[in-house]
Curated annotation (Swiss-Prot):
Native organism: Klebsiella pneumoniae (strain 342)
UniProt-listed Pfam families: GerE
Protein's UniProt name: HTH-type transcriptional regulator EcpR
Subcellular location: Cytoplasm
GO molecular function: DNA binding
InterPro entries found in the cross-reference section: Sig_transdc_resp-reg_C-effctor (IPR016032), Tscrpt_reg_LuxR_C (IPR000792), WH-like_DNA-bd_sf (IPR036388)
Gene Ontology cellular component annotations, sorted alphabetically: cytoplasm
CDD domains the UniProt entry points to: LuxR_C_like
Amino acid sequence: MEYKCCSDKYIWSAHDSYFYKGLSELILDIDELIYLSQEKIRKDFVFINLNTASLNEFIRRDSEWLSAVKGKQVVLIAARKSEALANYWYYNSNIRGVVYVGLSRDIRKELAYVINGRFLRKDIKKDKITDREMKIIRMTAQGMQPKSIARIENCSVKTVYTHRRNAEAKLYSKIYKLVQ
């Protein structure tokens, strides 16, 4: 997991050239809506693409990537299946904001809103993953079985399945599909 500096614009994941190209064009397109200079955005911001292909790495190693971007203004670009996780990281770390990529949303306005620092907790309309659900998601991503998770978390197997089911409802997908 590495992030990349392309023409001083930081993106994560480094291999996602389509994301970089699209994001670069979007930022140039909304230049008149942004209060900060292009140079400051390139220098101080990290844009993270939370898509289903990269979610496994972000879930398993969230403490690593969060410490790697310390001191930067982190903007999460969240697909529908990763909105609840993006909200969790927004609440539990130093994230500047979340841009929700939906079919009916104007991504340009949302991106400008976040870059300008106007994204607040009240802007989160979707569910967020709880701490217990996140622990269970992490352990599932590491390949642990519900019985082992229950023993570690000091709860019943039924409780593990309940938290897993609740997390899956918020993520619109089965956990094992996201962490493959």
